[in-house]
């Protein structure tokens, strides 16, 4: 089997991808049997290509699933943890911009009664 092009995989449906994955795994099993029984060298070198193809198919499947989940949770209030932006732990714990801008009643009154003084410079 020749190497698979990923852009072709992206065009396929999930059922087609799962069928292809099953075929590739079956082929890999045959190649491993050939390796144990002392098969031809060209079959041994094919193992690497088939394993790569399996990885590519699995990657495309998982990417499609994640994309579908993102669409499903698009306008929801809460997101599953794996769909949230990674960031660092410290950044995730920080206050939001809104929380930082909030002021107590006392602060509001103080600013209202004692505003910043404005000075005009005579030239």
UniProtKB/Swiss-Prot annotation:
What start and end residues bound the annotated signal peptide? none
Any one GO CC term of this protein is: cytosolic large ribosomal subunit
Keyword annotations for this protein? Ribonucleoprotein, Ribosomal protein
Q: Name one Pfam family in it.
A: Ribosomal_L29
Q: Does the keyword Cell cycle apply?
A: no
Swiss-Prot/TrEMBL GO biological process terms: maturation of LSU-rRNA from tricistronic rRNA transcript (SSU-rRNA, 5.8S rRNA, LSU-rRNA); translation
Q: Which InterPro entries match?
A: Ribosomal_uL29 (IPR001854), Ribosomal_uL29_euk (IPR045059), Ribosomal_uL29_sf (IPR036049)
HAMAP family with a match to the protein in the record = Ribosomal_uL29
Assigned protein family: Belongs to the universal ribosomal protein uL29 family.
Matching entries from NCBIfam families are given as: L29
Can you name this protein?
A: Large ribosomal subunit protein uL29
Q: What taxonomic lineage is listed for the species of origin?
A: Eukaryota, Viridiplantae, Streptophyta, Embryophyta, Tracheophyta
